[in-house]
């Protein structure tokens, strides 16, 4: 327990009490808007000297506090002028400058070499594919979990105040979130809320990433602790300020709901992977152990983050019977039976042996759905032309379609069966031919007859050429059986995400 207390006790160097004054510095807005540091953003066309920028920002913030945002709508964009300028425009600038300011404390940790997340096991996408290759076949169950979102934006502010000890900055953040909350209400147009979220993606991305960072720092720390993690130890999930008082409350809730204290034994084979607002816990344990982890996680979210993570958002799947959709792949572990004849003296007998084999398959139906949304084919997978590209040159059109196929083929190079990529290649090649035919106002057949199919083939064979250069002795048939993970993949392909 003392170790938990030392971990949850914040370092004084992490408390930043003077973040708010940075909002009044002009260079913050220059950094936030990528303007030169010598340009004045607020004083351009106003006529004041640079020394008055602090006064202008202060007046703008004061006026923003005095607005009635319940009566605010998207049609007010030309009203509420200040110094002859749109106050809403300047409030947007202040918000972006504020986001740049609150990111500073966390950037300092990177510059100083400090780690907010105390774990050596959080890695990039580069380690996920070898994890699938080496570890997945030895596991039995997987928990497929949707990361819950805050039911109220105030929870994000409460979590952030552990790191930014600045009441003024947090109050300003509450104001912006309150403005968003009102724009998202029923009495205002939905377009206003959408526009606010779209213009301030950096703010919400920061809050979401901080939310995930705080969650992982505690979850992974607790995961690595005692050999027997009893449910009574879950008091460490609770708010740092009310550590001891909340333990009793948690035990009452837990005892009331479950009547018995469950034990969660340390599972040395558990693996944690987060991606696309989800995460998985893959384990070699039994179904009972996975159900205990499920209860553990539900209480973790509810008691520490005050989020009701419904058990229905956590799915327990047995890998031998279920193929989870993971990073654009259908991953499965199947038994590959084999018979071995053994002979001892004059007696011979057959020995049955089942070897686990890990398979990654390209999900063709979701892939076609993604291509259909991008207007490369219809819902049935029939290629269609791309009218918006018809004004480009022939080489640019072919190169764009070819790049789409090469990127998808490159991303799914780790698939054990690549026959589905032939379908993707057909869609991209036929859609390129249809677009070119549309541009030249002739039929696809006439276009291919005039130029020949070789023109398209040279743009759609880049991936096979890479394979042949890497493995000169490989045959064409062997290329589509070989599983290769490329380390230059830095993110999930948009068309492969199926989101």
From Swiss-Prot:
Entry annotated with the keyword Ligase: no
Pfam families per record: Intron_maturas2 (PF01348), MatK_N (PF01824)
Organism superkingdom: Eukaryota
Coiled coil: none
BP terms from Gene Ontology: mRNA processing; RNA splicing; tRNA processing
GO MF assignments: RNA binding
Subcellular location: Plastid, Chloroplast
Single GO cellular component term: chloroplast
Keywords: Chloroplast, mRNA processing, Plastid, RNA-binding, tRNA processing
Functional description taken from the UniProt entry: Usually encoded in the trnK tRNA gene intron. Probably assists in splicing its own and other chloroplast group II introns.
Similarity remark: Belongs to the intron maturase 2 family. MatK subfamily.
PANTHER family: MATURASE K
Protein name per its UniProtKB record: Maturase K
């Amino acid at each position: 327990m003392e170790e938990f207390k030392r971990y949850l006790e914040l370092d004084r160097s992490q408390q930043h009490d003077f973040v708010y004054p940075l909002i009044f510095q002009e260079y913050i807005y220059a950094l936030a808007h990528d303007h030169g540091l010598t340009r004045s953003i607020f004083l351009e066309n106003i006529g004041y000297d640079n020394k008055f920028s602090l006064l202008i920002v202060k007046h703008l913030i004061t006026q923003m506090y005095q607005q009635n945002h319940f009566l605010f709508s998207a049609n007010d964009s030309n009203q509420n002028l200040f110094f002859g300028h749109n106050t809403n425009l300047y409030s947007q600038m202040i918000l972006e400058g504020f986001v740049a300011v609150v990111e500073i404390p966390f950037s300092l940790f990177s510059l100083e070499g400090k780690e907010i997340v105390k774990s050596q096991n959080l890695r990039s996408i580069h380690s996920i594919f070898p994890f699938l290759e080496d570890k997945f076949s030895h596991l039995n169950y997987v928990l497929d979990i949707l990361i819950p979102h805050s039911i109220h934006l105030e929870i994000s502010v409460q979590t952030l105040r552990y790191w930014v000890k600045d009441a003024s900055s947090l109050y300003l953040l509450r104001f912006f979130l309150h403005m968003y909350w009102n724009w998202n209400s029923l009495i205002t147009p939905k377009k206003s809320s959408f526009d606010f979220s779209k213009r301030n993606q950096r703010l919400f991305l920061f809050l979401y990433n901080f939310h995930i960072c705080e969650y992982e720092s505690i979850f992974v720390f607790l995961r690595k602790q005692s050999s027997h993690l009893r449910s009574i130890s879950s008091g460490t999930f609770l708010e740092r300020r009310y550590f001891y008082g909340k333990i009793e409350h948690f035990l009452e809730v837990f005892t009331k709901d479950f009547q018995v204290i469950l034990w969660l034994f340390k599972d040395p084979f558990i693996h944690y992977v987060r991606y696309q607002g989800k995460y998985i816990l893959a384990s070699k344990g039994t179904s009972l152990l996975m159900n205990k982890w499920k209860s553990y996680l539900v209480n973790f979210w509810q008691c520490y983050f005050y989020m009701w993570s419904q058990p229905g958002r956590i799915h327990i799947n047995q890998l031998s019977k279920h193929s989870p959709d993971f990073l654009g792949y259908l991953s499965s572990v199947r038994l590959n039976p084999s018979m071995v004849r053994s002979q001892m003296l004059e007696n011979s007998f057959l020995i049955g042996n089942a070897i686990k084999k890990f398979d990654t398959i390209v999900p063709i139906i979701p892939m076609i759905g993604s291509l259909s949304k991008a207007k490369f084919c219809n819902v049935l997978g029939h290629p269609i032309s791309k009218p918006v590209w018809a004004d480009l040159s022939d080489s640019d059109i072919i190169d764009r379609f070819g790049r789409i196929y090469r990127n998808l083929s490159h991303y799914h190079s780790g698939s054990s069966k690549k026959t589905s990529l032939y379908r993707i290649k057909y869609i991209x090649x036929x859609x390129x031919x249809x677009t070119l035919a549309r541009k030249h106002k002739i039929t696809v057949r006439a276009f291919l007859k005039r130029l020949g199919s070789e023109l398209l083939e040279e743009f759609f064979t880049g991936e096979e050429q890479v394979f042949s250069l890497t493995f000169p002795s490989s045959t064409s048939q062997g290329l589509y059986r070989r599983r290769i993970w490329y380390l230059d993949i830095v993110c999930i392909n948009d068309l492969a995400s199926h989101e």
